[in-house]
């Protein structure tokens, strides 16, 4: 699973960051997804996460009783039908479009639009929109095509908006599932741009590339400046701390 993220912080002139994660996904005894982070590169200081609480929204259980762990009632589970209103429009090629609206205003329900097979009801695409824990989110999902994979997302994209104390934060996330195994499972939260380039399923756009270039150029300038003015022992302590701190 790869999760590239970009953050736009309105306060302070529009600061932008980008992070990418490459995770190994497994299921625990209860069938809950468990992620082991193999790679992690980021322009956020100390490789911290922004809006980390919304990352769980990237592994929705569309057909489950709740979409995200214990939060948000799925409109596609039979037990939750009483909480939603549905409108169906027939489409060509044996497809139908379903519009879903909450019967009552509540943070545990959402609006949704899905493309389904008219005969089987299998969902091929679905969009969700809602608000939970002070975060407004918009999620677009492409489901897997065949067999057991059709019950889970193949690709999930999300935009999340959060406002707090005058700061407006926007996070844009894309997760791709079912990537071929290329790297060793022994990796643990490694910051390696070369390895990330090998597994990245979606090429970086120009804006994302520019963010990385500015970050590494600035870090090089700081490192060069410190090398010229302070002992190397202090350089290792002060400059590399943000890289290794997460692994201590």
Feature-to-residue mapping (PLM):
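Gly/Pro-enriched, hydrophobic low-complexity segments
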Residues: 85-88, 93-192
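Structured extracytoplasmic
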Residues: 1-97, 103-109, 173-248
């Amino acid at each position: 699973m790869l999760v590239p993220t970009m953050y736009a912080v309105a306060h302070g002139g529009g600061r932008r960051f980008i992070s990418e994660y490459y995770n190994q996904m497994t299921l625990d005894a209860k069938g809950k997804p468990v992620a082991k982070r193999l790679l992690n590169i980021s322009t956020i200081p100390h490789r911290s996460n922004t809006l980390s609480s919304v990352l769980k929204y990237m592994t929705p259980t569309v057909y489950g009783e709740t979409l995200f762990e214990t939060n948000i009632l799925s409109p596609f589970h039979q037990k939750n039908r009483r909480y939603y209103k549905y409108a169906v429009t027939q489409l060509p090629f044996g497809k139908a479009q379903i519009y879903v609206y909450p019967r009552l205003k509540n943070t545990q329900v959402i609006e949704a639009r899905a493309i389904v097979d008219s005969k089987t009801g299998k969902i091929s695409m679905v969009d969700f929109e809602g608000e939970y824990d002070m975060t407004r989110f918009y999620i677009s999902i492409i489901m897997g095509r065949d067999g057991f994979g059709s019950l889970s997302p193949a690709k999930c994209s999300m935009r999340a908006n959060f406002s707090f104390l005058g700061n407006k934060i926007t996070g844009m996330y894309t997760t791709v599932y079912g990537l071929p195994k290329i790297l060793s499972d022994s990796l643990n939260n490694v910051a390696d741009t070369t390895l990330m380039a090998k597994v990245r399923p979606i090429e970086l756009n120009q804006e994302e590339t520019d963010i990385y270039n500015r970050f590494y150029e600035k870090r090089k300038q700081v490192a060069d400046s410190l090398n010229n003015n302070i002992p190397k022992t202090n350089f290792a302590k002060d400059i590399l701390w943000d890289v290794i701190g997460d692994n201590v």
